[in-house]
Amino acid sequence: MDFDLTATQQAVADVVTSVLDRDLTWQALVDGGVTALPVPERLGGDGVGLPEVATVLTEAGRHGAVTPALATLGLGVVALVDLASEEQQDRFLAGLVKGAKGGVLTAALNEPGAALPDRPATTFVNGRLSGTKIGVAYAEQADWMIVTADSAVVVVSPKADGVRMVRTPTSNGSDEYTVTFNDVAVADSDVLAGGAAHRVNQLALAAVGAYADGLVAGALRLTADYVANRKQFGKPLSTFQTVAAQLAEVYIASRTIDLAAKSVVWRLSEGRDADDDLDVLGYWIASQAAPVMQTCHHLHGGMGMDITYPMHRYYSTIKDLTRLLGGPSHRLDLVGAQCSSN
């Protein structure tokens, strides 16, 4: 496996970097054409695939950008391109084409006590959707929500009758909601034929992995630059053995997450079995990303406690992603289940 960026991925990375180096906002990504990259060419997009979307998310994470990029591109567009018919894509992706105002998509996947469940408690019976989803990013702003249910994957408007939203707190301050569906009517044309919660969860975890990869790499770069320039006793902090050793631990975790994230994306894009790699990726993010962020904070000293300093965005977002994945104990249970089944 060669995990070097392809020419297309490098071009995508260059575009995202050029945008985010100037402005970290969602509108900047929209104006820069980034949101249209995975939209099919017939709709005015560039038609790039999962590896390129992962590149977008990694670069967004590397810059510490807190935007609807993960929800829209990673949880929304990727699943629709994979599962929706052309007619459905034409409707649901209309807000992301070049020249549009910048639509937002999201996915309602998690449930109370269940992170990315392959067998959701949310029910879909006779065209009616009922259940509760938690941790739904940007639900109120979204044009459409992809919802996993016990027997189908459906697309619902947040404004549909029977949809109730309550905003819930996040570490990084981004918008997140608990969404309750009370006998919501869903047309046959809004059901993703052949869609299954397991597939949607696979794609979602791959997207989260790409974003987390960038977040840890960005925090590592920020910290390495800080200790190289911050002097103590007349010497850069980076020359102290303990500092160098701690930074090396962050580097090891960063490289491992990068390897796992890219392996998952490669396997999914090639149609290979990715379940084992996905479980390893989920566990490594949930168990290692937050601790190495703590190390980065520690190496920044008092500067790391300033919420206006970029380090705060990296750490707080990783905390939210860890919660989305269900935490380290849950992810370790999934790894153990894979080992026992094999």
Feature-to-residue mapping (PLM):
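N-terminal glycine-rich flavin-associated loop
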Residues: T67-E86
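Alpha-helical interface subdomain recognition
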Residues: M1-G61, G99, Q202-N342
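Structured catalytic cores of enzymes that bind and process phosphorylated ligands/cofactors
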Residues: V77-V78, T106-A107, Y283
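Amphipathic alpha-helical segments in well-structured domains
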Residues: L50-A54, L73, Q89
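Anion-binding (especially nucleotide phosphate/pyrophosphate-binding) glycine-rich loop
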Residues: A60, A65, G74-G76, V97
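Short helix-capping/linker segments at secondary-structure and domain boundaries
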Residues: D82-Q88, A152, A217
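Extracytoplasmic/periplasmic mature domains of Sec-exported, cell-envelope-associated bacterial proteins
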Residues: V66-T67, G234
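FAD-binding core of flavoproteins
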Residues: A94-R221
